[in-house]
Amino acid sequence: MASLFTPFSKDISSRKNISSPTDSFGTNLSLKRNFDFGNERPEINSLICLAEPIMDITSEIDIQMIQEYNLKWGDTILVNETGDDKIMKIYDDLEKMPTVEYVPGGSAENTLRVLGWCLNMEPYERNRFKVSMIGSIGDDVYKDKIIKALGDLGVNPIFEILEGDKTTRCGVGIYKKDKLFATQLRASKRLSEKFIDEHLDEIISYKSLFIEGYMVSNKFNICKKLCEYFVKDNKLIIYRFQLLLLLNFTTKK
């Protein structure tokens, strides 16, 4: 996996005629870093991810199902949380399919899945690189599924379980090479600052912090608090922005 600071060409001589960006003082910006580690490169052996946990309900579907719900391939729709939309039935239909799979979804969980694969992490083992995820889920049928699915990837879930609430889910319909997504945001957007405070010592024990972009817009105060601790200790902070509007929002903040 390429580093953020890896040049396009390892042969420096081939890049001698390419000018590097500079600031108003003529300093080469390509050599700047957000962290001052001195002459030592820190050992980053753990990462904690702050994100919105989503349970993907994935299955192959037929064209008739698309027509029934008046959807288009490539659609990503938000389903009303109160469940009064006609589209609500799509989740039941997907779960009745013989090909249904329950997969940790969302941008952060997808990133952690790739990270686990790259690091060859083993399920429920003490891996050399420790990865955890903090977020909120509902006390429902998806609770155990999402906890087990992350554990199978070698990711330790640190979840606030909200009684009387329901886990965020996304219905994913697949037809040949096309997909559609029906997301219902629920418990994942209600992570409390109290839960963060209760687990603060554990959170800041990690060497790096990975923040999903949606958390910056939905839980800005939590993100700000954790970033202050990680910056104070000169630790690595990673953001993942899914949409340009999130980047604009964060820049303004």
Name each region found by the language model.
Residues L71-D92, D144:
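Acidic-glycine-rich active-site phosphate/pyrophosphate-binding loop
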Residues E60, M65, G83, V114-W117:
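N-terminal low-complexity, intrinsically disordered patches enriched in charged
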Residues K86-T99, G154:
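Glycine/charged-rich beta-loop-alpha catalytic/anionic-binding loops adjacent to active sites
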Residues A2-T76, V100-V103, E125-K130, S136-G138, ...:
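Ribokinase/PfkB-type carbohydrate-kinase core domain
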Residues Y102-S132:
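Active-site alpha-helical elements of protease catalytic centers
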Residues A108-L112, K143, C223:
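A general structural signal for well-ordered alpha-helical segments in protein cores
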